[in-house]
């Protein structure tokens, strides 16, 4: 099974302007071997109004992306309503309950983690969320940099993912970032 990655979502306001970014590394691991170093695990959805990223089984993640994107379209881009309906649908479907993937979805106002059990978790501060094998490293770095360093949002995401890549053997520093 393909696994291991780090995805970091970051949203907030700087200088009176809202921002939302998502970043991820490019490493794909199969067992104890790196099989790809430049994979893309982040996407822009609904006319570039929502960002998303996944960690876990690649095939499962694409199933989740497709399902979430369909619901997001039906809710006309309303992220909050979409994650609630996504969770309801996920829990009803026996196949989906076995998927081994997690997602972060965010826009300028909200950031959520969608877990492999169908749970929807809003980030504690509605600002920073991370998933994957290096997620805790990236989350810790992002919180510290957000609190003390006062970096531009893109630089904060990049530096946090670099720290995760230096610490987690399943995460590299081939970083891709999308922003709204």
Swiss-Prot record:
Annotated GO MF terms: metal ion binding; threonine-type endopeptidase activity
EC number: 3.4.25.2
Keywords: Allosteric enzyme, Cytoplasm, Hydrolase, Metal-binding, Protease, Sodium, Stress response, Threonine protease
Domain of life: Bacteria
SUPFAM superfamilies named among the record's database cross-references: N-terminal nucleophile aminohydrolases (Ntn hydrolases)
Pfam families with a match to the protein in the record: Proteasome
Binding site for Na(+): 165, 168, 171
Subcellular location: Cytoplasm
Classification via InterPro entries: ATP-dep_Prtase_HsIV_su, Ntn_hydrolases_N, Proteasome_sua/b, Proteasome_suB-type
Family according to the record: Belongs to the peptidase T1B family. HslV subfamily.
Protein name per the record: ATP-dependent protease subunit HslV
Gene: hslV
């Amino acid at each position: 099974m393909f696994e291991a990655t780090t995805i970091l979502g970051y949203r907030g306001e700087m200088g009176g302007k809202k921002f939302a970014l998502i970043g991820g590394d490019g490493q794909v691991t199969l067992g104890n071997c790196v099989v790809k170093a430049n994979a893309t695990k982040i996407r822009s959805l609904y006319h570039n109004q929502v960002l998303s990223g996944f960690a876990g089984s690649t095939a499962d993640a694409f199933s989740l992306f497709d399902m979430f994107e369909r619901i997001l379209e039906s809710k006309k881009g309303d992220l909050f309503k979409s994650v609630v309906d996504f969770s309801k649908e996920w829990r009803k479907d026996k196949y989906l309950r076995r998927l081994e993937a997690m997602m972060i979805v965010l826009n300028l106002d909200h950031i959520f983690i969608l877990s492999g059990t169908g749970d929807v978790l809003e980030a504690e501060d509605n600002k920073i969320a991370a998933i994957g094998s290096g997620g805790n490293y990236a989350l810790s770095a992002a919180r510290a940099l957000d609190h003390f360093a006062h970096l531009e949002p893109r630089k904060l995401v990049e530096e946090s993912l670099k720290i995760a890549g230096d610490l987690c053997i399943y995460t590299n520093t081939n970083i891709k970032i999308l922003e709204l």
